[in-house]
């Protein structure tokens, strides 16, 4: 969504106007760019049926992303499976979007309630993420609940954030 700007000028010396200059222009190229400010969520140790989330646990920081481009962006979120004993999507692995700055995105269509994490792309979770400096970032909170049949091992998941205009 690049923009072409055209202009021309003419001078005034208080007695009259001169001729218009030739038309000049410049192009403002669109930049679609997101920075990950916090890219790691660590829940520590959780036992069987244990649960944790980044909104209730004050010492666990959520993902934080910022639009540092110059156009609004849509963000799709998906991840690899966190648990071995359950398929995705499930209530055992969820996310929700939260504004860090008021007016950062379209509240009517953004996933601000707990939503089951999926392992396929295609569902936009953040709509119209603003690019202006005072309202351009958001948190992605994560909630996990250890399934009853889950074996005790180290768990991890890769969360992917895809952007588009």
Predicted regions and their residues:
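Sequence-pattern detector for short linear motifs
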Residues: 11-13, 101
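Extracellular fibronectin type III
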Residues: 14-28
């Amino acid at each position: 969504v690049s923009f072409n700007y055209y202009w021309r000028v003419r001078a005034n010396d208080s007695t009259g106007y001169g001729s218009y200059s030739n038309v000049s222009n410049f192009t403002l190229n669109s930049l679609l760019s997101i920075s990950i400010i916090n890219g790691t969520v660590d829940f520590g140790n959780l036992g069987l049926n244990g649960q944790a989330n980044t909104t209730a646990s004050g010492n666990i920081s959520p993902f934080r992303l910022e639009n540092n481009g110059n156009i609004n962006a849509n963000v799709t979120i998906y991840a690899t499976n966190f648990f071995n004993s359950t398929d995705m999507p499930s209530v055992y692995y969820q996310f929700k979007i939260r504004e860090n700055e008021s007016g950062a995105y379209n509240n009517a269509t953004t996933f601000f309630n707990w939503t089951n994490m999926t392992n396929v792309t295609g569902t936009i979770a953040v709509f119209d993420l603003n690019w202006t400096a005072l309202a351009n970032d958001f948190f992605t909170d994560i909630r996990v609940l250890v399934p009853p049949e889950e074996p005790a091992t180290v768990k991890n998941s890769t969360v992917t954030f895809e952007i588009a205009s």
